[in-house]
């Protein structure tokens, strides 16, 4: 039997081959040069891999599954381009962000173009087209809502952990839910099955984002392909920050208001007060919830999806 990491490597290579084959016009260069630059990036392809694993579970048509995978990855890249502008990040996947390489106006247009490309690909699927587009667009809108909430929450000291969890379900969970559920929609599975896959992906997304927030503080900048600690400097209300603010009010205020403090000071604070431990446990709970959702599937359909959860849970970048 093929090893799981060999399977995901194969899916990633096949996906990259299809993405590189996608016809991107040469002109106008103002639009298509930054799009080509973005899509040549060495992403982890977590979302396309999930689409393909879900497609394998439901025995979906391979060509249609690939189109779904392309569509969700394009939407993901569209959000990254615009997020980088909003967060003023200068590096993504180890290379300059689009707005840093060109300018904000170019990056905005490139993101718009990539989003439109995703729509064209999804609408070219001949089976269940309306249902796929409706589900896909609802998830895409939720991602935008989540990003809006993330910006609204910056430096807002009234934000609670429930607010944060609602935000990450939209910003990260909705698209991963779509990755898991769209193959079930394609294969005309029951509403109960589609919903279970959506909830599976949303729980996976919550665990993914909480884990990502931890990597933003405790990760290796070389593996992450970017500098760390920007969540702190931008006033992001992550779960760690909310717990610190609510339960270690004076110590957190002194630390966060001291502009001379370094990332290592924050690491020590979160570890010493067992905030890191609590947040890691929270991520584990969401990964566990994701596992429970797919246990309604036949056993042979669960194995690869459970392996995927473990892969996401143990990632270091």
Briefly describe each language-model feature range.
Residues 1-23:
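N-terminal amphipathic/basic leader segments beginning at the initiator methionine
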Residues 299-317:
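Short, amphipathic C-terminal "tail helix"
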Residues 241, 290, 305:
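Hydrophobic, well-ordered secondary-structure elements that form the walls
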Residues 24-253, 310:
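Mg2+-dependent prenyl diphosphate-binding active-site environment of isoprenoid biosynthetic enzymes
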Residues 251-295:
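Mobile late-domain/C-terminal helix-loop "cap" segments
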């Amino acid at each position: 039997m093929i090893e799981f990491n060999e399977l995901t490597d194969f899916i990633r290579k096949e996906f990259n081959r299809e993405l590189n084959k996608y016809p991107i016009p040469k002109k106008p260069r103002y639009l298509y040069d930054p799009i080509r630059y973005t899509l040549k990036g060495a992403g982890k392809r977590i979302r396309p891999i999930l689409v393909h694993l879900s497609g394998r579970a439901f025995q979906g048509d391979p060509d249609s599954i690939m189109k779904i995978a392309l569509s969700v990855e394009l939407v993901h890249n569209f959000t990254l381009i615009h997020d980088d502008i909003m967060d003023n990040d200068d590096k993504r996947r180890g290379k300059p962000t689009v707005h840093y390489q060109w300018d904000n106006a170019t990056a905005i247009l490139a993101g718009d173009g990539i989003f439109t490309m995703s729509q064209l690909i999804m609408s070219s699927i001949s089976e269940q087209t309306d249902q796929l587009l409706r589900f896909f667009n609802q998830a895409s809108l939720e991602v935008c809502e989540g990003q809006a909430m993330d910006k609204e929450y910056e430096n807002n000291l009234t934000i609670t952990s429930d607010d944060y969890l609602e935000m990450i379900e939209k910003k990260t969970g909705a698209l991963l839910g779509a990755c898991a559920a769209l193959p079930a929609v394609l294969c005309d599975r029951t509403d109960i099955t589609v919903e279970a896959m959506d909830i599976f992906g949303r729980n996976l997304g919550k665990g993914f984002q909480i884990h990502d927030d931890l990597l933003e503080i405790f990760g290796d900048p070389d593996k992450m392909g970017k500098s760390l600690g920007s969540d702190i400097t931008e006033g992001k209300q992550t779960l760690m920050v909310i717990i610190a603010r609510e339960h270690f009010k004076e110590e957190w205020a002194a630390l966060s208001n001291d502009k001379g403090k370094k990332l290592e000071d924050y690491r020590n604070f979160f570890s010493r007060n067992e905030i890191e431990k609590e947040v890691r446990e929270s991520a584990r709970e969401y990964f566990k919830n994701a596992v429970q959702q797919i246990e309604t599937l036949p056993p042979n359909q669960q194995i690869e999806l459970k392996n995927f959860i473990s892969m996401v849970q143990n990632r270091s970048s």
